[in-house]
């Protein structure tokens, strides 16, 4: 009985191998999908954020990543800005931590 099993296993042979070109093509397709779905949008967001950071000027109303809303009072060349939260409180933060530049008059509406 066991000799029939060994004959059946030997008759199936080795599984067919795919061509290496199909593997390379699949890797290229996955690389392109990764680039267009992840890297390209991230580069676009980074470029827009850098443009936003360069456009910050004195008097702009900004929203920080921490949720603070204030008016820019000073813009330093070393990457820091001073934000007045109210008449008495001023905070110095890195320019990179600005999440958005708000329309004029937003602070008065709050």
UniProtKB/Swiss-Prot annotation:
- Cystine pairs: none
Q: Which UniProt keywords apply?
A: Cell inner membrane, Cell membrane, Membrane, Protein transport, Translocation, Transmembrane, Transmembrane helix, Transport
Q: Which residues cross the membrane?
A: 19-39
A single GO CC term, please? plasma membrane
Where does the UniProt entry say this protein principally localizes?
membrane
What's its membrane topology?
A: Single-pass membrane protein
* Compartments (UniProt record): Cell inner membrane
GO BP annotation list = protein insertion into membrane from inner side; protein transport by the Sec complex
- Which NCBIfam families would you find in this protein's record? yajC
Function statement: The SecYEG-SecDF-YajC-YidC holo-translocon (HTL) protein secretase/insertase is a supercomplex required for protein secretion, insertion of proteins into membranes, and assembly of membrane protein complexes. The SecYEG complex is essential for assembly of a number of proteins and complexes, assembly is facilitated in the presence of the SecDF-YajC-YidC subcomplex.
Q: Relate the assembly described in the record.
A: Part of the SecDF-YidC-YajC translocase complex; YajC is also present in a homooligomeric complex in excess of the other components. The SecDF-YidC-YajC translocase forms a supercomplex with SecYEG, called the holo-translocon (HTL). The stoichiometry of the super complex may be SecYEG:YidC:SecDF 4:3:1, YajC is in the reconstituted complex (with SecDF) but as no antibody is available it could not be quantified.
The family this protein is said to belong to = Belongs to the YajC family.
Q: What's the protein name?
A: Sec translocon accessory complex subunit YajC
Q: Which organism is it from?
A: Escherichia coli (strain K12)
Question: What lineage does the source organism belong to?
Answer: Bacteria, Pseudomonadati, Pseudomonadota, Gammaproteobacteria, Enterobacterales
């Amino acid at each position: 009985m066991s000799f029939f099993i060994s004959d059946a296993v030997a008759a199936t042979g080795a599984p067919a191998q795919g061509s290496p070109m199909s593997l390379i093509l699949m890797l290229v397709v996955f690389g392109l999908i990764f680039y267009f779905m992840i890297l390209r949008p991230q580069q676009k967001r980074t470029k827009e954020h850098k443009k936003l950071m360069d456009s910050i000027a004195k008097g702009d109303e900004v929203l920080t990543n921490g949720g603070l809303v204030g008016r820019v009072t000073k813009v330093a060349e070393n990457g820091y800005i001073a934000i007045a939260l109210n008449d008495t409180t001023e905070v110095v933060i890195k320019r990179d931590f600005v999440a958005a530049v708000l329309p004029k008059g937003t602070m008065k509406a709050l």
